[in-house]
């Protein structure tokens, strides 16, 4: 009990008193402490200071690069300074790649330059580049269905627009072209792939990102076009004349190398072996500074742990913050973490991740057994005043967290407003000025409520069905 922290007023105090008269899994004093933590978070700018530090002092940090090395060192130093009880790293193995110059231009019928970005781990063109005719497809499914004879030797252009949504639900359909397009183009004998950027903006920035490389024997160059340049190609093609594009791309695959998951713990006072795991990913793409993806998430979970570590006593269970490495190239850090700790996953009480930018949180989802909904209902008493509504019980907890959920670990998700997230996602425009300090404060307030109460609840969630 931490009664000196408790300062309740009016309606909330009454609500907590009513809750305490029923058989509920969270004690009134724990809810009271969570309220104080929430209100402290709303008054603090420390999360913004963290993301400012990361973007200014480290900057881009693609897995396996010098920036990644600096980020790992930065994270360890910050965790120690924030009062974590244990700070350590676990090595992971990552593919490495060097991005070189990428140039694209229309050479006929209307010569003009195009703004492009190589997709992650994309191949280079032959010396001197390639020039070929464009063939357009509405989506990757159309490319997959096309006869190889129509595609061979041409540059396949996937012209799929992404729909804007608060939930980001337009990303799934649109990203199929990025993940599957290069493989499809290579199998059809295309000279290269051009992809309308997977984004919702109309800025002249291209959106990079990872693509599937598995089983591709002869990869072809693959580049994202900015939305205005995709519109330009579309307009040229409508004029009924063949459109020829020249590409000159200099990328290089490097030998595999190490990266790291960075882990910090606030060790539990009663049940240190039981773990509430909250995370974000430390790596970013290399053309912006990764402020939204995922610098904000890194700051949110680190600040959450700092607030809990400053309490007069440690939480009942261990709070573990994992800053996953190499998320952007395929959830590598999370996958290797789960494999390395497979025998201990039953000790993880709950997992959650912040990896959707820095918008305000508007919804609280779970993936817990139905018999445990009372815990989430009690958490909602303190989340609702932040403008957060109760969602569904289908949460993955976040991209990295989904790897844990697939093994039966319960999850919770605090979902941010993603209306404009994909305007900046994976672009040079993902920079600190897009992060609003007031939104970060609201995020941390929600995270500290959820995380603290998960460490203090009387009972655990048990397991959820593992996914095959």
Segments from the language model and where they lie:
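N-terminal signal peptide c-region/cleavage motif recognized by signal peptidases
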Residues: 18-20
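N-terminal capping segment at the start of a domain
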Residues: 25-65, 205-213, 283, 354-359, ...
């Amino acid at each position: 009990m931490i009664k000196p922290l408790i300062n309740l007023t009016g309606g909330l105090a009454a609500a907590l008193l009513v809750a305490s008269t029923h058989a509920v899994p969270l004690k009134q004093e724990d809810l009271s402490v969570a309220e104080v933590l929430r209100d402290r978070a709303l008054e603090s700018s420390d999360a913004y200071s963290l993301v400012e530090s990361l973007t200014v002092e480290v900057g881009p940090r693609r897995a396996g690069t010098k920036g990644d090395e600096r980020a790992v060192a930065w994270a360890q130093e910050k965790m120690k300074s924030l009062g974590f009880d244990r700070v350590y790293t676990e090595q992971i193995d990552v593919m490495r790649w060097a991005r070189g110059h990428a140039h694209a231009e229309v050479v006929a019928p209307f010569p003009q330059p195009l703004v492009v970005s190589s997709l992650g781990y994309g191949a280079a063109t032959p010396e001197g580049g390639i020039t070929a005719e464009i063939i357009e497809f509405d989506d990757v499914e159309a490319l997959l269905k096309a006869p190889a004879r129509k595609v061979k030797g041409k540059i396949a252009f996937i012209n799929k627009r992404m729909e804007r949504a608060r939930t980001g639900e337009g990303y799934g359909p649109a990203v199929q072209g990025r993940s599957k397009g290069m493989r499809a183009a290579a199998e059809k004998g295309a000279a290269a792939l051009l992809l309308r950027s997977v984004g919702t903006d109309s800025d002249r920035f291209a959106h990079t990102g990872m693509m599937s490389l598995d089983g591709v024997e002869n990869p072809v160059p693959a580049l994202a076009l900015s939305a205005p340049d995709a519109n330009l190609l579309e307009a040229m093609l409508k004029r009924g004349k063949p459109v020829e594009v020249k590409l000159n791309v200099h990328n290089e695959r490097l030998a595999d190398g190490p990266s790291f998951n960075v882990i910090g713990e606030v060790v539990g006072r009663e049940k240190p072996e039981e773990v509430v795991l909250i995370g974000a990913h430390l790596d970013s793409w290399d053309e912006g500074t990764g402020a939204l993806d995922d610098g904000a998430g890194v700051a949110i979970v680190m600040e959450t742990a700092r607030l809990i570590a400053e309490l007069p006593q440690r939480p009942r269970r261990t709070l573990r913050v994992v800053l996953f490495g190499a998320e952007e190239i395929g959830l590598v850090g999370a996958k290797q973490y789960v494999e390395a700790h497979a025998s201990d996953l039953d000790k993880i009480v709950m997992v959650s991740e912040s990896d959707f930018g820095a918008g305000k949180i508007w919804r609280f989802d779970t993936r817990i057994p139905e018999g445990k909904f009372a815990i989430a209902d009690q958490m909602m008493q303190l989340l609702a005043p932040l403008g957060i509504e109760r969602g569904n019980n289908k949460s993955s907890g976040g991209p990295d967290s989904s790897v844990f959920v697939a093994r039966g670990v319960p999850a919770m998700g605090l979902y941010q407003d993603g209306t404009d997230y994909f305007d900046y996602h994976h672009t040079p425009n993902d920079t600190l000025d897009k992060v609003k300090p007031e939104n970060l404060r609201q995020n941390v307030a929600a995270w500290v409520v959820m995380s603290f109460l998960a460490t203090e609840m009387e009972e655990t969630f048990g397991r959820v069905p593992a996914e095959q």
